Amino acid sequence: SLQRGEIDLSRREFEQVLQREPNNTDALLALAAIAHRQGRPADAENMRQRALVANPSDPAAQAANLNHAATDADPNTAESRLKTLLSGQPESPPLNFALGNLYSRQSRWSEAQQAYFNSVAAEGDNPDYLFNLAVSLDHLRQPRLAAQHYRLALEAAAKRPAAFDRDKIQKRLSELQPERQP
């Protein structure tokens, strides 16, 4: 249901999972993402914290908490924590994605691109990882590669939920490669 964009149905389904399994990290993180999308930041934070308490060593729970905490916290502390976690799990897609997000907030595009590339290398069908890699390539003035990854992000978004606006990607693709319109 989440893949089809049925957010309210997805929310109910994940809440049912939590009734059976109160510490299900995947359900907690999914509910955090849903709450974030619905503009309920306190609920999202609560779910991320519950996921981390339920499974402190889970890379996705760690990344979700660090990714959102990094917007408010000292970026140097967040970067140090992410790098420490990555030293033990260098191929972790969510940790690399969180590090890329931290770098992008600081306009450190070359470093962001590398972190996003690491996420895509480990989980190449994640539309958000592909999209953020495309954005970083776009900022690094690599229009051909950016366009390629924007297209891959759109293809992946047809199969999995994505946090980006598909219409904006289509518009950006037309700006990058006007001759390749469908």
Language-model segments: which ranges?
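Structural marker of alpha-solenoid helical repeat scaffolds
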Residues: 20, 54-55, 87-89, 122-123, ...
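TPR alpha-solenoid repeat register
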Residues: 27, 61, 95, 129, ...
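Canonical tetratricopeptide repeat
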Residues: 30, 64-67, 98, 132, ...
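Structural signature of tandem alpha-helical TPR/SEL1-like repeats
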Residues: 4-13, 37-50, 71-84, 106-118, ...
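Terminal, low-structured helical/coil segments at or just beyond the last alpha-helical repeat
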Residues: 84, 136-182
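Short, highly charged
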Residues: 1-54, 59-60, 64
